[in-house]
Amino acid sequence: MGQLRFITGGESHGAALTAIIDGLPAGLQLSRAELDAQLARRQRGYGRGGRMKIETDRVLVLSGLRFGETIGAPLTLQVVNRDFVNWTDRMDPFGAPSGERITAVRPGHADLAGVLKYDRRDARDILERSSARETTMRVAVGAVCRQLLAALGIDIASHVTEIGGVAVDAAAIRADDIGVTNSDDLNCCDAAAGARMRERIDEAKLAGDTLGGIFEIVVRGLPTGLGTYTQWDRRLDGRLAGALMSIQAIKGVEIGAGFACAHLPGSEIHDELYMGADGRPYRKTNRAGGLEGGMTNGEPLIVRAAMKPIPTLMAPLQTIDLATGEAVSASKERSDTCAVPAASVVGEAMTAFVLADAVCSQFSADNMTDLQASLAAYRARLAEVWQNA
């Protein structure tokens, strides 16, 4: 177990969503504007549904912060669901049940397994919590963690590389382009590919269908040696993969060259080392994606995640009605046609949490002054290795 942990609570159409972060060092300065800016990024994206026109997510801090600085206590965050006023009859915590039960479970969703596991008769009891609305609080948590990382010189960015089979021209994308697309409604660095992606999304929306895609996360400024090979559950690659796979609709994660490693010989995969003029080693390639042996190796961290199409279709798939056993069309909920750009923001947030936890665990400190000093001393020791070689 690391130093940081968080839990979230709340339903998609409930009164509010909540998160509690435990283990943050005291003295971390937090910007309310930055917290809200990350939530706004999650709400944007070409292909999002009508819900995003209702909600304007803003973070309320209920504990653990005074005058803009963490105090070492658990940090409690809340986002109010403005749409709750339209759902009070169906989501009342103590009132009598009202509204039609959802029994036509959706293929690809948590509906069927959830009602069986928790012995429910209404799939709304499942879909309200399994909804990706929960990621609002993951982004809020990530917004805190990325401010901690920024104070340590570590930067996180992402971009969408594929939607619905339309892919960017990776060779044409410069490293400096990634992270400057935050205002783009697709978070895409390739304008030509972005135009084709929008066309595919429009086509899918007309057909009542949905689209998935791929996003890439890039992290710069990480020290060499973050993570460890000594135990399976402390390997940084495993922790990152698990965090990203926990995001709703994510079906695959790869680091660096990823699955391409299976098709090529080692001579074409492993990054050769060279000694630079400054007396430090460097690599001409980064197929490892910045991770070797479960540890950072000094190169930028590169992680990609594949998102499946959202399982709520406006042209529903066939399913069964759990109340009657008959073949019916799956139920419909207000949903998105494509949420890959939003998922990239959630991916950044989960990456930020894992890395913030790794840093706080490895350079353990109860306050930011000591944490920054500990990391600075470690970086200085690594620099001396090559100076004295």
Regions found by a protein language model. Give the residues of each.
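Generic N-terminal targeting/processing segments that precede catalytic cores or assembly contacts
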Residues: 1-389
